[in-house]
Amino acid sequence: MENEFSPNIPIYIQVMECIKKEIVTGRLAPGNKIPAVRELASELQVNPNTIQRTFQELEREGIAVTRRGTGRFVTSEGEKITELRKEMATEL
């Protein structure tokens, strides 16, 4: 993932868009584990609270799910992934 962030858009939204792109392109497939908060924060050089906020929003949108004790994963709901692909296609 890239860590060149625009000052005009909140970082958590930019990180969320990066994760969505990885899902749409297949780098993160349905059911795949999403990197841990600290791991992703370190990789992107951002505050862990920013990544936590990103994950909360992804869960709210139904794109990510938390499995207690094992971490966060891309949803296995094919309908949600298809919806995300359509949404991102219209943005291009």
How would you name each of these model-derived features?
Residues 1-33, 39, 83-90:
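Extreme N-terminal segment that seeds HTH/winged-HTH DNA-binding domains in transcriptional regulators
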Residues 24, 29, 60, 67-69:
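Short glycine/serine/threonine-biased micro-segments
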Residues 34, 63-74, 78:
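Short, Lys/Arg-rich nucleic-acid/phosphate-binding segment
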Residues 34-65:
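N-terminal helix-turn-helix
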Residues 44, 78-79:
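Short secondary-structure transition/capping segments
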Residues 53-56, 85-86, 92:
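Short, low-complexity, polar/charged sequence segments that are solvent-exposed and flexible
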